């Protein structure tokens, strides 16, 4: 096949257009004479590129199809009508009727849904509740209320409330025929039997599946044996092996605790219990710890009144005598509490110390 000719560029078209203008320049009656107009048109046609016949045919065919679709739309538009949207219902839950036949021109601006599966995505029917239970006096008008009051006596005798489940309802559920548009053969909504499964009710189809599942289950003993057979290295379990394993586990546990205690002791983070368990001798009090503390406390208590007596002077001699007697009694009581070693130490200290008693008048006379 010969190569296709390249499309003329704009520069070439401009040159040819200029040639046409040069040839038609100065012609008289260019706009009036038919012969001159034919000549000018022939020049223009010679300059302009010839259109592709295939593209022209495709464009013509496309225009014919659009005209045909427009004609069909005009014919079918009369028969298609959008449904009325009830109060409180989302329009997007209703499929657009024009979209079903491919005639909706609004696109995403259409208030109706363009999803054909929107009806399947709705709420599933509940087979464990009776739809008639939701009908209350709040939904009745005056006429309905009067009819109910007029026929209540006879209706109660005919349709007594019962908890028996309708056999037609059970049959429809078992055969998977129950749905939003199912009507009870026993009078429809007037059927006085329950159209709801009792709590915990298991259908026969479900029961069959459960029985098959239970039959396929393996007993625990058999499963243990199967798992035991899968183990390649088997060692018979005996009492000695078990005790050895238990001892190793205890040693590992003790080693772990010892390492943890050592780490905590290294970081000075041991608790009192851990310190006591590590070395209980640290927490033993000295034999004289309590007695020394008691003696110091009593000596401090005796020093305070003596200081007060020195500040008061000789006028309080009688009171001083009483305090001295009381202090002597306390010393006697303290001595009663001392043991033999402490008494020996006290006697030795007193023998090394020379006690000088000076009367108040002796200092002045000398």
UniProtKB/Swiss-Prot annotation:
Residues 54-79, 208-234 form a coiled coil. SMART domains: ZnF_C3H1. Residues 312-321 have a biased composition (Polar residues). InterPro entries: ZC3H15/TMA46_C (IPR032378), Znf_CCCH (IPR000571), Znf_CCCH_sf (IPR036855). Pfam families: DFRP_C. GO terms for molecular function: DNA binding; zinc ion binding. Residues 43-66, 293-338 are annotated as: Disordered. Disulfide bonds: none annotated. Keywords: Coiled coil, DNA-binding, Metal-binding, Repeat, Zinc, Zinc-finger. One of its GO terms (cellular component) is cytosol. A zinc finger (C3H1-type) spans 90-117, 160-198. GO terms for biological process: cytoplasmic translation. Residues 325-338 have a biased composition (Acidic residues). PANTHER family: ZINC FINGER CCCH DOMAIN-CONTAINING PROTEIN 15 (PTHR12681:SF0), ZINC FINGER-CONTAINING PROTEIN P48ZNF (PTHR12681). This is Zinc finger CCCH domain-containing protein 11.
